[in-house]
Amino acid sequence: MIKIGIIGSGNWSLALSKVLISPEVTIKARNIDKAKKKFPKNKKFFIIDNFEILKDFDVLFLANPSQSLRGILNEIPKNTKSKFVICSKGIEKKTNKLMSEVLTEFFPKNNFAILSGPNFSFEVIKGLPTATVISSKNSNLSKYISKIIVQEKFRTYFNNDIIGTQIGGAMKNVIAIASGFIIGKGLGL
């Protein structure tokens, strides 16, 4: 069985846990008690606070806030062979680096993909139909990640433009807020 880990215990982690095909998912959380209350009982969740356990996982989904990614990557064992899926959207404030650039500082040889909307965690949690992009320079990795995601209401598309995908993901909320403002003011689109 494939070993899947999700680092982070926020709403995006909950959303991911609902669309992953594995009956068992390990969640790395800072607050174990809070995480246990959040995740559904229909899957077998292992909620941990130790990064060392994750070194032998097949896939690690990084679903933490973008500004905390560097600190989290620093705690993951350097000998991990895991494939990474970056779900964090944003640009690191201190360095102006994309999340993939931060990841490759720590794990330059590991395969990685970017998972990015256009979607919102609440849509996925509610089971609403939505789509996402899996972006990787390695098309086989994109296909592999797609196969571990339930496709019924969470459709995946592929591309190899990791930079464009990350910029789009970082700008998504800004555009959504601006669009909401324009609509709210009756200014049209």
Listing of model-derived features with the role each one plays in the protein:
Residues 1-49, 55, 59:
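NAD(P)+-binding Rossmann beta1-loop-alpha1 motif at the extreme N-terminus of oxidoreductases
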Residues 2, 23, 45, 82, ...:
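A structural micro-motif
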Residues 13-16, 50-54, 58-128, 145:
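Rossmann-like NAD(P)(H) cofactor-binding subdomain of soluble oxidoreductases
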Residues 32, 89-91, 116-120, 138, ...:
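Glycine-rich beta-alpha junction loops
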Residues 32-38, 93-95, 141-142:
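Short, charged/polar "capping" segments at the starts of alpha-helices
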Residues 42, 68, 79, 102-111, ...:
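Internal alpha-helical scaffold of NAD(P)-dependent oxidoreductase catalytic cores
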